[in-house]
Regions:
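Metal-dependent phosphoesterase signature
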Residues: 1-19
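Asp-based, Mg2+/Mn2+-dependent phosphohydrolase catalytic module
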Residues: 21, 25-28, 33-142
């Protein structure tokens, strides 16, 4: 059926945003613990990360279909923090969605970095940081 074909095709899609591999590799080498957080299907998202060659950079993955809550539900973030044994002040959420990533993380006290490659207006919610290319994150996290 269409849904199965869509999921399989989506799972095989693994092109990275420019600078993503270098950014993840550098942060991993600097000793940062990296976690992926996504609203998607767990096995498909992990397959995409594996095919892109970046899964080894992550300590863990937090996927909505596995957890039972979607971002921006605070229970998603609470689960991830608890599971990773981290407090909100030890985490920086980097994401491209103002609603699910930035607002969701802020509601539990996590600092945020909005990846905004198209220079969209920020609006009323202010992220802690804003970057327009992923390699800029390397200056935010020395």
């Amino acid at each position: 059926p269409f849904t199965q074909g869509f999921r399989q095709g989506w799972g095989n899609s693994h092109a990275l945003v420019e600078g993503a591999y270098e950014m993840l590799q550098t942060l991993h080498q600097r000793g940062y613990k990296l976690y992926a957080a996504s609203n998607s299907f767990g096995h498909l998202q992990r397959m995409r990360l594996q095919l892109a060659g970046v899964l080894p950079f992550f300590e863990g993955t937090y996927i909505s279909m596995d957890i039972g809550y979607d971002k921006p539900d605070r229970r998603f973030y609470d689960f991830a923090l608890n599971d990773a044994h981290l407090s909100a002040d030890e985490v920086l959420m980097v994401g491209d969605s103002m609603t699910t990533d930035i607002i969701g993380a802020q509601q539990v006290g996590i600092d945020t970095c909005w990846f905004n490659p198209t220079h969209r207006p920020i609006g009323t919610t202010q992220p802690t940081y804003e970057i327009h290319d992923l390699l800029s994150l390397l200056t935010v996290l020395p």
